[in-house]
């Protein structure tokens, strides 16, 4: 078998590669800048067919299996264990690489209600996102920034991997899409809490801390707005303005998660 890092990566960044691989259905991009200036050694692009795992108010979806909403934490964790068991295992495994497949996505804070008895004070949000949503793609590109080389990991036969490698190389040789620099419109985001309500919340938080009820409380507010922007452009802007450890861009069905 050829060495895993057998694709030249000196002409592309993970961002340009993600854009060029549009026809291969990229699912996520994971990058990292450490210390505010030093790029992490590895970046990752997951793409192609994938196992989707989603829990919302109606069902617990694990691939083709549509299960009932878990009644308790035990059922929830058992479902996640099943998802990990069913997740594709891209190969070859590379010892030093920190990610070689698995579930990539998010779990919302409200999942805590499976583990703690909490009152339901706030009204349900319209069009609320799933409680959790993960994707586990069959194919993974690993960028090694120290050697300027790329590895293709794939859950399939070696002949399938070879054919996919050719498709990846052909895509990377092509131009970046013209939409990569397209501009869009947006309305300024609006906070769900007014300034006055937020200040009152800060005051109550201080009272809870002084009374010993809590030792830490993160008061937050949801912001929402309308836009006609490509979510990937939002990620690019965030990446330029605030390069950070653990940057992510995830396409999860109709939902895109950026941070």
Q: How would you name each of these model-derived features?
A:
Residues 1-259:
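Extended alpha-helical targeting/anchoring segments
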């Amino acid at each position: 078998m050829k060495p895993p890092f057998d694709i030249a990566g000196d002409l592309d960044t993970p961002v340009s590669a993600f854009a060029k691989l549009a026809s291969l259905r990229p699912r996520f991009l994971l990058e990292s800048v450490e210390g505010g200036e030093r790029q992490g050694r590895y970046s990752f692009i997951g793409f192609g067919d994938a196992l989707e795992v989603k829990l919302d108010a109606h069902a617990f979806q694990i691939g083709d299996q549509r299960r009932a909403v878990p009644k308790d934490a035990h059922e929830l964790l058992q479902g996640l264990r099943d998802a990990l068991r069913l997740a594709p295992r891209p190969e070859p495994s590379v010892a030093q690489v920190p990610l070689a497949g698995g579930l990539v996505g998010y779990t919302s804070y409200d999942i805590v209600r499976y583990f703690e008895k909490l009152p339901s004070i706030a009204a349900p949000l319209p069009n609320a996102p799933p409680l959790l949503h993960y994707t586990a793609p069959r194919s993974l590109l690993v960028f090694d920034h120290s050697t300027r080389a790329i590895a293709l990991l794939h859950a399939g036969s070696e002949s399938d991997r070879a054919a996919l490698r050719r498709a990846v190389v052909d895509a990377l040789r092509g131009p970046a899409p013209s939409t990569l620099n397209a501009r869009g419109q947006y309305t300024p985001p609006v906070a769900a809490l007014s300034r006055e309500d937020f200040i009152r919340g800060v005051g109550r938080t201080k009272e809870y801390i002084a009374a010993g009820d809590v030792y830490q409380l993160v008061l937050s507010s949801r912001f929402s707005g309308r836009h006609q922007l490509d979510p990937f452009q939002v990620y690019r802007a965030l990446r330029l303005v605030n390069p950070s450890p653990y940057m992510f861009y995830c396409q999860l069905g109709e939902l895109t998660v950026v941070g």
